[in-house]
Design a protein with these regions (language model features):
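Low-complexity, polar-biased intrinsically disordered regions enriched in Pro/Ser/Thr/Gly
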Residues: 1-5, 118-119
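Soluble extracytoplasmic domains of inner/organellar membrane proteins
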Residues: 3-85
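Extracytoplasmic/luminal low-complexity segments enriched in Pro/Gly and acidic/polar residues
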Residues: 64-121
Length: 121
């Protein structure tokens, strides 16, 4: 299959997510899905799956952190915002005084990590 200019590929979301994380984001959600270390972001047909839920445009990132630092990081010349814009993806940045990001509501299942209670048994 060829490149679809109207489809947002998960790689774009992951690049933005990584830039925000490396710039000090303390909490991030995409379309109200809290992002944690085990969150999946993948393509499924014409949708992006985030934490098991299907989404399509628009994608709204909510980010808690130092607004100036985060904005500067993603707006570097030749950075992620330039990449998105060059791929026909419009980016709008809006600073808010107060942002609420819900806690992760899914299950976190680990195979190799034990809780303190499990270790004591």
């Amino acid at each position: 299959t060829g490149f679809d200019p109207f489809l947002i590929y998960p790689e774009y979301l992951l690049l933005l997510l990584n830039e925000l994380n490396s710039s000090g984001a303390e909490a991030i959600s995409i379309n109200e899905q809290r992002i944690i270390s085990t969150s999946e972001i993948r393509l499924a047909g014409n949708h992006i799956v985030i934490n098991g839920e299907k989404f399509s445009r628009p994608f709204v990132f909510k980010v808690i952190g130092d607004g100036q630092t985060l904005q500067s990081a993603i707006q570097l010349r030749g950075g992620i915002v330039d990449l998105l814009n060059s791929n026909y993806i419009q980016v709008t940045i809006k600073k808010e005084e107060e942002i609420t990001i819900a806690k992760y509501s899914g299950l976190v299942d680990f195979d190799y990590i034990l809780s303190n209670e499990e270790q004591e048994q």
